[in-house]
Amino acid sequence: MSTQTTEEALKLYFALKKRGVPAELEKFDGYKHIDIAIPEAKINIEVDGKHHNSNNRQALADLKRTYFSFLKGYYTIRIPNSLVYNDYVLNETADFIVGILNESLNKQYGLR
């Protein structure tokens, strides 16, 4: 199965890498390709276009994939494309994701 990374996912991926996040692009989890995966923190990031919210079938398929990832211990963050178009908003989005990652790792390793 071939997968093509969207421009929006690439922009967020590079913004996270710039912040030192050990992100992996298009990671296969045995079921599907994750746009951006951070296995160390057990977090998956999906960068979603409009069709993910306007199409019932797509939205339900996304929810099911989120559920099955959750059963494996992974939390999925869904980022709408609108948060990566503008550089200012992209940077703010990446900063918030770094905050989520730090909190996740702190909880995993009992640092709080």
Predicted regions, residues:
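Nucleic-acid endo/exonuclease domains
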Residues: M1-R112
